[in-house]
């Protein structure tokens, strides 16, 4: 289910429903986590999300285990998407944006989001060519960003 541009209250109701269906309680700590994701364009590791919450809302009493459990639940419910970053683990973002792909710098970890209608069309053509019903995809391109390229003099 794609949740493009949902208003926060609609997103929160969906979140509460998913928690109920998963046999979990709605808590203020979980809402703080959802609100933090909603109001940010950052791709978070569980640890960086935890630190962001602790810094922004020190009285929220959110534990790292709650962050991990809630992110897993949100990912299963397709409310967040994750990017696999090899040994660095996963980074998460809320799924309420229009579809986009990612370029990930292998040096600094910078993530650049992009949209390209030609790539999207080509993927559909390839799927049709193989009689494959495309329901979604996640594209991650790895390389070296321009900042790191200038610093290390690596040729792209």
From Swiss-Prot:
UniProt record, GO biological process: negative regulation of DNA-templated transcription; negative regulation of siderophore biosynthetic process
GO cellular-component term (any): cytosol
InterPro entries: FUR, Fur_C, WH-like_DNA-bd_sf, WH_DNA-bd_sf
Gene3D superfamilies, per the entry: 3.30.1490.190, Winged helix-like DNA-binding domain superfamily/Winged helix DNA-binding domain
Subcellular location: Cytoplasm
Region (DNA-binding): 1-96
Keywords recorded for this protein, A-Z: Cytoplasm, DNA-binding, Iron, Metal-binding, Repressor, Transcription, Transcription regulation, Zinc
Residues reported to bind Fe cation: 99, 101, 120, 137
SUPFAM superfamilies referenced in this protein's UniProt entry, alphabetically: Winged helix' DNA-binding domain
Molecular function via GO: DNA-binding transcription factor activity; transcription cis-regulatory region binding; zinc ion binding
Region Dimerization, annotated ranges: 97-156
Keyword Phosphoprotein in record: no
Binding site for Zn(2+): 43, 93, 102, 105, 108, 113
Domain of life of the organism encoding this protein: Bacteria
Subunit structure: Homodimer.
Role summary: Acts as a global negative controlling element, employing Fe(2+) as a cofactor to bind the operator of the repressed genes.
Family affiliation: Belongs to the Fur family.
Protein name as it appears in the record: Ferric uptake regulation protein
């Amino acid at each position: 289910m794609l949740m493009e541009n949902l208003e926060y209250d609609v997103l929160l109701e969906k979140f509460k429903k998913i928690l109920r269906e998963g046999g979990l309680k709605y808590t203020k700590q979980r809402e703080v986590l959802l609100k933090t994701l909603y109001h940010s364009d950052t791709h978070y590791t569980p640890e960086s999300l935890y630190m962001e919450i602790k810094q922004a809302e020190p009285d929220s009493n959110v534990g790292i285990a709650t962050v991990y459990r809630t992110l897993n639940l949100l990912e299963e419910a397709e409310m967040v998407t994750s990017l696999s970053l090899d040994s660095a683990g996963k980074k998460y973002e809320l799924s309420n944006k229009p579809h986009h792909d990612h370029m990930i710098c292998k040096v600094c970890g910078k993530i650049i989001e992009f949209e390209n209608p030609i790539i999207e069309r080509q993927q559909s053509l390839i799927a049709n060519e193989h009689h494959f019903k495309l329901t979604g995809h996640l594209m991650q391109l790895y390389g070296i960003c321009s900042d790191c390229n200038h610093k290390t003099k690596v040729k792209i």
